[in-house]
Amino acid sequence: MASATTSDHAKQAGGAHSRQRDSGLLDQLGKLFGQEGSRKVPEKGKEPATRSVLMAPTTHKAHQGARRQTDDSPVVHFFKNMMSPKKAPVQQKAKSGASRAITKFIWGTDGQRAHYGAAGSSKSKDGFRGRKDGSGTLSSFFKMGKKGEGSPARR
């Protein structure tokens, strides 16, 4: 065959899976965002080559300082934060009595957040409803099983 098409030349040069990509779209996007000259290769002798070598370690060190002190994986870090007990916020000396009163109202006087729907400060030491008088959930279940109560089929 005497004449070859452009696709034949492309196949001969790089094969069917050429590593060279058509960067026309990328060039257009670069021009659009104004980064056309940001990837220029410096000519020999015009710009020192050590500039890029010196900049890489400094950026690496800056990123190392921002990392966590411990080398925990993100999963371990997540579970440590989830399983640790929640701490009440540190109360600083308030400038006015009003802001201190608001903080006490929100967090309660002993540093524990009040339950939703509780008026004033709730006593968390009382625990479950009916703990002393025997009207809790388990007590009511056992009372259902007493003889003479319940449905006639169970008597």
Swiss-Prot record:
Location in or out of the cell: Myelin membrane
Region of interest (Disordered), ranges: 1-72, 113-155
Modified residues annotated as N-acetylalanine in this record: A2
Gene Ontology CC, one term: plasma membrane
InterPro entries: Myelin_BP
Iron is among the record's keywords: no
This protein's UniProt keywords: Acetylation, Cell membrane, Membrane, Phosphoprotein
Job of this protein: This protein may function to maintain proper structure of myelin.
Protein name: Myelin basic protein
Organism encoding this protein: Leucoraja erinaceus (Little skate)
Gene from which this protein is expressed: MBP
